[in-house]
Design a protein with these regions (language model features):
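Intrinsically disordered, low-complexity terminal tails/loops enriched in metal-binding residues
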Residues: 1-288
Length: 288
């Protein structure tokens, strides 16, 4: 029997590699994908959160920034597209093309207004009673979006000189009261929320007399509006109302769908209209 030379061993090894590679390619082509391979992510993906002034091809351009505290402080900005030109048309998002928020870093100041377009610039004004560190957010839905439920949110920090009385963020609790005397109680369980898990948050609204509201007046084309802000990161989270506009509220309860992308505490601001007035209730929730 002839002994195998070094060359024979090399040719044998090459042949084995060719056979194995061919088998892998054959099975890779012929084996259908499994059910798990076709499945998407098991948890919702995070969305635009206002931590950047540029995202998804859009950029926030400062035109007029708040310079002093006071009432009716002017703000103006442009939204630039990928080509660097101002974008002046967006889809309606709860009846408005542009939502604009301002929060102070202790969550004691919250403003939600709707800028108007002047040429290529969005103009508005906000009440800023105290100095301190703030963040502003521009929220809009591009005309060509493939995900109309999740707007683009661009955020820009700013600060105001002057006396600042920092207010500790309230601990998570079930009940809140508006400045107009309404009580709002969170009734869903458990109290602590899971990160990147969709949840429905339910809020029972009572009049100053303690009577459950039977229905709410339209506010931004819905029963209410809710936005959350991470108390440390100052990121924004958009929550979606569940009950259709005009439907009676069972026991005065209003429901929102929410997904929170980060662990920590969030401050939620619920806005609703009743008896011709806008009411705002704030809640702190914990996410783990």
């Amino acid at each position: 029997v002839r002994k195998l030379t070094f060359v024979d061993w090399v040719f044998a090894l090459v042949a084995v590699v060719i056979v194995v590679a061919g088998s892998v390619m054959m099975f890779g082509r012929s084996t259908p994908p499994t059910q798990h391979q076709n499945m998407g992510p098991v948890v919702p993906a995070s969305h635009s959160d206002g931590l950047s002034e540029a995202e998804s091809g859009y950029r926030f351009e400062r035109v007029v920034m708040p310079a002093n505290r006071g009432t009716g402080v002017p703000v103006a900005f442009r939204i630039l597209g990928a080509d660097g030109k101002p974008v002046t048309r967006f889809l309606d998002n709860q009846t408005k093309q542009m939502h604009f928020f301002v929060v102070r870093d202790d969550m004691h100041v919250f403003r939600h207004v709707h800028p108007v377009l002047d040429g290529d610039t969005w103009d508005t004004s906000v009440d800023l009673p105290d100095g301190g560190a703030y963040r502003m957010f521009a929220e809009f839905i591009p005309l060509d979006t493939k995900d109309p439920l999740h707007p683009v949110v661009l955020g820009v920090p700013f600060s105001l000189a002057g006396d600042t009385e920092l207010v500790p963020v309230p601990q998570p609790e079930a009940q809140s009261r508006t400045g107009t005397g309404y009580s709002v109680t969170r009734v869903d369980e458990p109290a602590t929320l899971g990160v990147m898990s969709e949840r429905k948050l339910r809020f029972a609204i009572r009049t100053p007399d303690g009577v459950p509201v039977e229905g709410l007046e339209p506010h931004l084309g819905a029963n209410g509006h809710m936005t959350g802000f991470h108390t440390m990161l100052l990121s924004a989270t958009h929550l979606h109302p569940v009950e259709p506009l005009g439907a009676p509220l069972i026991n005065g309860e209003l429901t929102f769908r929410a997904v929170f992308a980060d662990r920590g505490e969030y401050r939620l601001f619920l806005e609703f209209s009743h008896h011709g007035r806008l009411h705002t209730a704030a809640f702190t929730v914990a996410v783990e």
